[in-house]
Amino acid sequence: DLAGQDLTALTSDHLVIGLFDPVWDARPAQAVAATGAAVLSLDLVPRSTRAQAVDVLSSTATVVGFQAVLMAAERYPKLFPLLITAAGTIPPAKIVVLGAGVAGLQAMAIARRLGATVEGFDIRPEALEQIRSLGARSIEIEGPEGQETPEEQNARNQAGLIPYLAAADIVFTAAAIPGVRSPILVTETMVDAMKPGSLLVDLSAQRGGNCVYTQANEETLHGDVTILGPTNLASDMALSASRMFANNMVNLVRMLSNEGSLTIDRKDDVIEPMLVAIGGEIVHERVQQNLASATSPEVAS
């Protein structure tokens, strides 16, 4: 984190690149902007083909999804694959993944490679084919023909997921919305329906979690269900995570390079969405709204 002496060294000639997360809490980026330095936030990378080369969040999520499955496999007292032995047949572990973003899809892929049966769910119709492409079964919850409110859809999905969670050995939740609290996917009723000894790994714990019982960086026991809320799984795979981050940064510097110097092109469709501040002013619309409403979670508390 930049503070104190670090900030006093900055001038309008500097460009500061980092994971400021300014839509969640604008104050760190605002403090840097006050020095006149330009600010690029890596968590504001747009979703486009060209931007993938600098998408730090996707790189991190890839590592998180991988490590989450390994952690669960170590914690859960059951083998993942189907085994037919002289001592009898051992059925495969049943895994449910809620959220088919980068971390969720990676978790599905790794769990499948370890031999588990995997089911995946996402509210986005386009994600269903991605789930199936990994060899997982897509969970599809039928809805009414007419228009539903978001609240009605959420309640229907939660009720429809109960049988799947009740049959699962391990549940991963990986639904996140940039800049806001993680949506609640798993309610008290859903946890109560899970079988004794089952495990829930919440990959969105840093923003409150997708499960009502999740505590960041804590292990919570509700009944006979264990709920894990890790927030920094990427550090457990530091070599790979650092390599991917370094490659993202190299690609970003190449985008910024212009005849031997770094130039911020306000017309660039990757750079402009990442630009939080320049010339001492906050220029990102959502960050401006954050500051105007003063509703950053830390401010509101």
Feature roles, as predicted:
Residues A103-I110, L128, A174-A175, G179-L185, ...:
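Short glycine/serine/threonine-rich phosphate/pyrophosphate-binding segments
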Residues L79-A168:
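Glycine-rich phosphate/diphosphate-binding loop of Rossmann-like nucleotide-binding domains
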Residues L2, P144-V171, A175-D192, P230:
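A structured beta-alpha segment of the ubiquitous adenosine-cofactor-binding alpha/beta core
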Residues F20-V54, V180-M237:
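Rossmann-fold NAD(P)-binding glycine/threonine-rich loop
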Residues V23, V63, G101-V102:
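Residue-level detector of alpha-helix initiation sites
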Residues D43-A87, C211-A300:
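Adenosine-phosphate binding glycine-rich loop
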